[in-house]
């Protein structure tokens, strides 16, 4: 067996410097798809790539130059990349999601097209955990509503008025906090909650035995048990097809009457209509949501618009000045690793690495071994005749047709050559792809940081598949 066939398939994005007596060589193009500020990314990438911003909400707003030439893309959570969107990019080799969630990217399609998808799962853990505790404390002590009463001019002249206004305030010590998911953020919340006197339990079917003992927590093995035992439920898991509307009519009935609910994970985990009804009926005493199924959240629209005892914040749990800088630096560094190294070897957080791994060889006709790629990764475009067949079509790394494997470096070189030919034709440069000082074709012109960034939700190692969900397929 040829041992080379068991090795990862490697792609390399070509990086060329200046020749002493020659023209400036074009660098790989990296695009920020749905933002404008590249001031943090530029110092990390400027010596190996040209950086452009698109400030787009969909691929229809992305300039043709980026679609044809970009080998790397940075993106927040405000743009969605479906398979059809991904096929518009002719030279793309890597996407880095500035955040932890990748639910706005068709990861499977990206892998089949030879595009590595990476995220930044480790940033903002402290910020989200702190925000979670802030929301929990507000629900228990009703600080948010009491502050609003004072702001509206209400006067408290005696204990009876205080008692009336603060009705529903609860003591924390001795209550049970139930965490759905005990990853980075869930663990951070657990440690903070214990300091306040909570009895902390958790449900996470994907963690090894003993994690509860190492943290001094109590583990339950079904979601029903967690909901039944918890005075406050806090969600800390990713969103996928298995746990969409995890909090629904059926699961709310499993909760203790008058329990609290907190969600700083993903909006789609909660069915808004069912939650609104539960708040009106008092089955859930109060709820706090930093994330919403439809964002940006509009307090005057949707099922929750007239729900009582509800705190909503604008998907900002992840944010602090320090975490925002850290997040963007980590994302840009991942792009840099892809440019100067081999994909997927150098990538720290590639979520579809399996599409770049070779499987054991299968016996071909005449006894010749043939390399097989999972899902046809990198193979599809090598034999495609669709209009989208650009430089991607040269990245069948295991093909022996045409003299052997072709690297991403050659693909990038082909894109550069095509761009050079296109440069001979007059074409206007859009305002958001402005010239950069120093001879680089594109760059940044704004230092305004995007205010709407993704949350760094901690995640379970896989999807939460619960008995409750299987039993509640009829729930809204």
Swiss-Prot record:
Residues 445-476 are annotated as: Disordered. Keywords: Nucleus, Oxidoreductase, Repressor, Transcription, Transcription regulation. InterPro entries: CtBP, CTBP_dehydrogenase, D-isomer_2_OHA_DH_cat_dom, D-isomer_DH_CS, D-isomer_DH_NAD-bd, NAD(P)-bd_dom_sf. NAD(+) binds at residues 100, 180-185, 204, 237-243, 264-266, 290, 315-318. Its main location: nucleus. Belongs to the D-isomer specific 2-hydroxyacid dehydrogenase family. Homodimer. Interacts with hairy (hry), knirps (kni), snail (sna), and Enhancer of split m-delta (HLHm-delta). Complex may be involved in transcriptional repression. Also interacts with adenovirus E1A protein. This is C-terminal-binding protein. It comes from Drosophila melanogaster.
